Amino acid sequence: VAEMSDAAGTLWLDVGRRDWSDKLLAATGLTRAQMPALVEGSDVSGTLRADLAQRWGIPRVPVAGGGGDNAATACGMGVMTPGTGFLSLGTSGVLFAATESYAPNTGDAVHTFCHAIPATWHQMGVILSASDSMSWLSEITGRAVPDLAGLVPDDVGAPSPVGFLPPWFLALSPRN
């Protein structure tokens, strides 16, 4: 079983239709028969196995579809309706916004995926080395991270044409 928000990252899902793409599967020599069943994040995808329920001393509870990491984070933060979003900065950096329809934005290389909430999508930009990049700069300059962050003025406007794309870590945005 695969859940929609996680399946969207496989590139085999027709994200707008929330179904496997026969065209993309065929392009990679696969068929629907080789793919898992698709469920929404809130759908029951199975039941806890009897042996595990017995071992853990709990009933055979339903198991929900769940969600991909960022979609599940969004649900936990209440980012489930259009116009809501979050910014997460850690080892990776994510800018996530819930949307009411499939609205790809390939011109800006922003991902458009299914949300873990039925009939909802999300757009996100991701870089897998957000705070790691600051740590790297701190190490090579010998300056503490707070000191480097203090160099950025409070009234920063539009992004500068100068860019930084760390080559040692994967970047999902702006290259998709």
Model-derived features: positions:
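Active-site core segments that coordinate phosphate-bearing ligands/cofactors
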Residues: V1-A2, D6-A27, A50-N176
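Conserved N-terminal phosphate-binding loop of PLP-dependent enzymes in the Aspartate aminotransferase
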Residues: L30
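Short active-site oxyanion
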Residues: A33-L38, P59-V63
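Glycine-rich phosphate-binding loops at beta-strand->alpha-helix junctions
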Residues: E40-L48, G67
